[in-house]
Amino acid sequence: MDNFPHWVDHIIAFVFCIAIPLYAARQKSKGTSFIHFSSDQKKQIYISGSFSLFVMGAIVVSVWLIFKRPIAELGLTQPGNFRSWWWLAIIFVVVYLFDTVVSLSSKKGIDDTVENWKKRTPFLPTKNSELPEYFLLCFSAGVFEEIVYRGYLINYCWYLFDGNNYQQMIAVVLPALAFSIAHFYQGAKAVLKIFFLAVFFGYLLIYSGSLLIVMILHFLVDAVGGLLTIKYMKEVQQPGDENNFLQ
């Protein structure tokens, strides 16, 4: 593509690769131990988070279109060459299911996982009534985060490191690293898992030429995570929050 990366792309890449991850790491250092959110507060978080993700994606797509770049290069096209990527998707699903089953296969594992949810991600849903707004957030993350961190930043790094012997690896790993650090509030273990998840997604994009499968998998991972918290995490009731668990 001509005129890529432009100085505008450098600014966008700085924001998503450096500024946001550093901000996330700084927020992590403040700690969020055992904060309680009511259902209404969670729904507000999901809606505002969805809007923020939409803005992120809209900025990237707008810049892409302003410079008249092929939208398919951003990954917004149908996946092709099925034989080259289907196995990668299967491996991802198997690894994810294995990790989930192992984490929740014993009482100690469940207790540790629930304790971590309460400490690191207290905004996750604990009632069925919170699911519509939560699924909206999952959809927004699956679509707009993938547009930014896979479709856009992999392209950016690919062109930035053109001619480098490790071009493909760098193009996948750097956005994956930024994406995982941006989730630093979830703890070091989660950051490591998210990094490998993001690497899988990066290679899925490269081999399939499309973000579609990646978006679907991303949505499902987040959605299943919310369903699991509803199943296993008991909400700490606060005065004025009279909704029953699993309402």
Residue ranges and their predicted role:
Residues 33-36, 44-48, 109-114, 165, ...:
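N-terminal start-of-chain detector that recognizes signal peptides
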Residues 39-44, 65-141, 159-164, 234-245:
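Juxtamembrane helix-loop-helix connectors linking adjacent transmembrane helices
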Residues 24, 28-32, 103-108, 151, ...:
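Short helix-terminus and kink motifs of transmembrane alpha helices
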Residues 59-60, 103, 107, 149, ...:
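Alpha-helical transmembrane segments and their lipid-water interface positions
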Residues 13-22, 123-247:
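Transmembrane helix-loop-helix hairpins at the membrane interface
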Residues 10-18, 49, 53-57, 61, ...:
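Alpha-helical transmembrane spans of integral membrane proteins, capturing the lipid-embedded, hydrophobic core
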Residues 1-82, 227-247:
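N-terminal, membrane-interfacial amphipathic/helix-forming hydrophobic leader that caps
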